[in-house]
Amino acid sequence: MTEVLSQDEIDQLLTAISSGDASIEDARPISDTRKITLYDFRRPDKFSKEQMRTLSLMHETFARLTTTSLSAQLRSMVHVHVASVDQLTYEEFIRSIPTPSTLAVITMDPLKGNAVLEVDPSITFSIIDRLFGGTGQAAKVQRDLTDIENSVMEGVIVRILANVRESWTQVIDLRPRLGQIETNPQFAQIVPPSEMVVLVTLETKVGEEEGMMNFCIPYITIEPIISKLSSQFWFSSVRRSSTTQYMGVLRDKLSTVDMDVVAEVGSLRLSVRDILGLRVGDIIRLHDTHVGDPFVLSIGNRKKFLCQPGVVGKKIAAQILERIESTSQEDFEELSADEEELYE
């Protein structure tokens, strides 16, 4: 309630202002600096900011994988990157799509419900032209796909879905499958118009053609795994899978590396003068080696086994006798499995 000043209080206030003892600024009401956020009850937010960031990270991986796979398939420069990740109603998404367009309805097994992958017409026709042997220039007319073009796009989308599965691995073992391809957005009603969805918009460039791909996923589809869409869960999963994946790749690469295997008769120390004086026919006496002693078999400059020299057919060979230092039993059995009779 507003306070009413008496005449004496008014006179005192006017006197203070005229004498400079009180500032006019002090009499002004203090403005409210609190930030007010608008909230639309017709479209409540279903995803937190952290969950949206996690979805963005997941689909950045998807964008990189798709860039690589499409570039290899089309033999052309393809670039895909995440432009935005938003939440909106399904009706708003449908209204934003041109007609005709390429809409792939995708089952998200084991999650319930479907998702939609929408490919801009300019990108669709650029891909088709490239696969048909052209330069990748998109058609300038808006039309539906022919049966052959539709079949070609099915193959491309199936390949893209493999990237979706890979990018979701940290959260769930997703097995997305292509249901059907629609060209009219009104025929792709996967959820009620008012249902909230997350829309991942991907800027796509095929050759010189630029356009968009949109991946639309309903909230009811993601809801069972919503707790896993956290930064902590995501990064811990990435570290675990990365370690396992990289160890497997490292093991595969190392298994194909060529190693030097040397059977050493013996060794001794010589002066530089003696080495420079060596001639063909000279005999070098190995003081610490006797006739019949086993050779030392070194692998990658590390002494691993004792072996016996001999021949197999017309080839010089060495038979492994025993290990020198710690080598796994599996490696030893593999090296000594194919023993053949050796002749001195």
From Swiss-Prot:
Biological processes per GO annotation: bacterial-type flagellum-dependent swarming motility; positive chemotaxis
GO molecular function: cytoskeletal motor activity
Entry function: FliM is one of three proteins (FliG, FliN, FliM) that forms the rotor-mounted switch complex (C ring), located at the base of the basal body. This complex interacts with the CheY and CheZ chemotaxis proteins, in addition to contacting components of the motor that determine the direction of flagellar rotation.
Family recorded in the similarity comment: Belongs to the FliM family.
Keywords: Bacterial flagellum, Cell inner membrane, Cell membrane, Chemotaxis, Flagellar rotation, Membrane
InterPro entries linked to this entry: CheC-like_sf, Flag_FliM, FliN-like_C, SpoA-like_sf
Gene3D superfamilies in the record: CheC-like, SpoA-like
The protein's name: Flagellar motor switch protein FliM
A cellular-component GO term for this protein: plasma membrane
Name of encoding gene: fliM
Cell membrane as UniProt keyword: yes
Topology within the bilayer: Peripheral membrane protein
